[in-house]
C-alpha cells in the first residue's frame, strides 16, 4: 500500500532535511500541540502600535500587557497553555510559528496579528 501522490504522511522519505526526533517539537519553532502564550490585545491598531513601541524600547512584555492589553484576563497577558484548535485562526497560526522566547529576550509578532477581537502582540513562552 504505497501512499498516493506527493506530500503525505509523517514517515515520508526525503523529509525536510532534519533527523526525526519523535515526540518533542523539532527546533525552537513550529510543531507541538500546545503553546504557553502571552499576548497584548488592543481593539485599536494605534494602541497596539504604541504597545509595540514600548516593547521595542525594552519594557518588559508583562508590564506592557498590564498597561495596554484590553483583554479581560489581565495577568501580564498570560493565557497559559493553549492547544491547537482552541485559538482563532490567525492567532493560532502566529502562535505556532513563533519560536519559544523569554521575558528577558521576547520574540513577538510584529506587526500585530488582526483577529475579530482586535490586534494581538503575541509571544510564546513554551511548547509541548
UniProtKB/Swiss-Prot annotation:
Give the family this protein belongs to, as stated in its UniProt record.
Belongs to the PpiC/parvulin rotamase family. PIN4 subfamily.
Task: Give the PpiC domain ranges.
Answer: 32-126
What this chain does, per the entry, is described as: May be involved as a ribosomal RNA processing factor in ribosome biogenesis. Binds to DNA.
Q: Tell me one GO biological process term.
A: rRNA processing
Coarse class of the primary localization is nucleus
Q: Where is the composition biased (Gly residues)?
A: 1-20
> Which reaction(s) are listed as its catalytic activity?
[protein]-peptidylproline (omega=180) = [protein]-peptidylproline (omega=0)
| Name of the protein this chain belongs to | Peptidyl-prolyl cis-trans isomerase NIMA-interacting 4
Which InterPro entries does the entry mention? PIN4, PPIase_dom_sf, PPIase_PpiC
Pfam families referenced in this protein's UniProt entry, alphabetically: Rotamase_3
The first-level EC class reads isomerase
Highest taxon of the lineage: Eukaryota
Single annotated GO MF: peptidyl-prolyl cis-trans isomerase activity
This enzyme's EC code(s): 5.2.1.8
GO terms under cellular component: cytoplasm; nucleolus; spindle
Tell me the segments the record calls region Disordered: 1-36
Q: Where are the transmembrane segments?
A: none
Species for this entry: Taeniopygia guttata (Zebra finch)
Keyword terms, alphabetized: Cytoplasm, Cytoskeleton, DNA-binding, Isomerase, Nucleus, Rotamase
Amino acid at each position: 500500500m504505497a501512499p498516493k501522490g506527493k506530500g503525505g504522511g509523517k514517515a515520508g522519505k526525503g523529509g525536510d532535511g532534519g533527523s526525526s526526533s519523535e515526540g518533542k517539537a523539532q527546533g525552537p519553532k513550529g510543531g507541538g500541540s500546545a503553546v504557553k502564550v502571552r499576548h497584548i490585545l488592543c481593539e485599536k491598531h494605534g494602541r497596539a502600535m504604541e504597545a509595540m513601541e514600548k516593547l521595542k524600547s525594552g519594557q518588559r512584555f508583562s508590564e506592557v500587557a498590564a498597561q495596554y492589553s484590553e483583554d479581560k484576563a489581565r495577568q501580564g497577558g498570560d493565557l497559559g497553555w493553549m492547544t491547537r484548535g482552541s485559538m482563532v485562526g490567525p492567532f493560532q497560526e502566529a502562535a505556532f510559528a513563533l519560536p519559544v522566547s523569554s521575558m528577558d529576550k521576547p520574540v513577538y509578532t510584529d506587526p500585530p496579528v488582526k483577529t475579530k477581537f482586535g490586534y494581538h502582540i503575541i509571544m510564546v513562552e513554551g511548547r509541548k
